[in-house]
Amino acid sequence: MLCNKRVRANVSQYYLLNMQDIPSLEEFRTQAATFIAAAVRSNDACPAYGAILPPHLHEPAMHWQRFCFEEGWAGVHWPQEYGGMGLTPAHNVVWHEECAIAEVAPYLNLQGLVLAGEAILRSGTPQQRERFLRPTLRNEILWCQLFSEPGAGSDLAGLQTSAVADGDQFLLNGQKVWSSNAQFAQFGILMARTNSDQPKHKGISFFLLDMTLEGIEVRPIKQMTGDSEFCEVFFTDVSMPSDSLLGEVNEGWGVAMAVLEDERGGAGAAGVISLGKRLETMAEKSTALDDVRTEKLTGILNRGKALQALMERRGGDPLIAPVAKLMNSELGYSEAQLNSLLQGAEAMLHSDTTENLLYSPGMRIAGGSSEIQRNIIGERILGLPREPQPSE
């Protein structure tokens, strides 16, 4: 990617943090905004995108992640020994907010930086942390998530993919589905059953799977958007080395639940900032913004502000994760529907609008369906009776 070398050099000279003194959030906000602005001017920053990474932004996103690492701005709250900045989760929230304000992507690979990386930081051995964390930040390893199965999506504990211990390795067999970008990933975070005699939530282990191992077949799934973001993955007698195990054998459920909390609870002010900017753009472009449509637009923004306030008050509370996931999914769906409504027939002439509209129903399914999130909220937060299962 072409860039202004003088501006790029100034990024390192003036804007890197002195990590001997952890800056206050406001100091860090100023530093982050300055760094991002310089990166935008030098064409090193990748423009923000929604749930889908468009093909034309793949290389810019790859470059932006590497650039942030080289300039010392990757992994805001990761330990310095693994290439991070050694700051706090609150500083990481500020980074996301400033990226949203500048309409810049905060990172490339959610599965790697948010899901796999955080899991390895929490549960990994020193060897696993050394092997995976820095290369992931440096964008040398892309990750995918291998959780859902044809018969175990919402009921994840019903998974059947097996990993049988065999000497110094595990023999992996089974199938996963709806794995984002598995066709590009070098590694995947995998849940597999290691003890079929134990109850559903037990007997499951968590693995860091090398996607280049023999016996792995990845088949991209054609979506109605025309893209193939999701894949189904088949495992036939795949020999995984024993050091692929993350955490203890048969104790993977707890590791996985923490990962899902990371995935579902990542919303906050940054998402609301991005939402507000997109709604503002909608209003500017619309030629039919009557009272009814204005009410719909402000209603979406107000719901976003409510989510932001909730996250600010209860941030870090794992019980908030399903609430955040549900609200984000519904906001994304409502936004896509409204954008199409405001543009009318012209919406079909704009590829981004059409793609978002076609993708929007999936927002209520991916990462845990809205129905499942409502069940979790009802049972775990509100204390309502458990929903009967079909077998009961």
Would you name each region that the model predicts?
Residues 4, 9-110, 131-135, 290-298, ...:
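Amphipathic, small/basic residue-rich leader segments at the start of a protein or domain
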Residues 161-164:
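A structural signal for short hydrophobic beta-strand segments in well-ordered beta-sheet cores
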Residues 169, 173-219:
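A short core secondary-structure module
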